[in-house]
Amino acid sequence: MDVRDSITDAVRSVLADLGVDPLPTTVQLERPGNPDHGDWSTNVALASAKAAGRNPRELGTQLAECLLAAPPAHVVGVEVAGPGFVNFHLADSWLHEVLADVVAAGVDGWARHDDGVGTRVIVEFGSANPTGPLHAGHGR
């Protein structure tokens, strides 16, 4: 299972255990701009707090505590930052596992797929005005 899927599933499970209703339809995971903020970050506590009638920071803290008690695969640290962002730190074992998968798949097997094979595509270049903002009308 992908580490992102593992984290997402764990977050949704903990939110359900905490009684957050309605559960978010998606859990957005992003790579933080600052490496000190972990390997992955989510704003799910901020997004869910209003509907749950809770303070985002407190919800994030509860989420982090529950996730630390039973961490998802490869997660070694969970912390709350700012108004309720939840940051995840991954173990080096995650990178080792991914690299082992890449080596095992070989040159011809890793990140290759047949999507779009045999399909013709037309590539157009828009004539955008360099002095103004780019918008949908430039694609005509």
Predicted regions and their residues:
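Conserved alpha/beta enzyme-core scaffolds, especially Rossmann-like or related mixed alpha/beta domains
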Residues: 23-31, 79-82, 117, 121-127
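Short, small/acidic-rich helices and loops at N termini and domain boundaries
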Residues: 36, 41-60
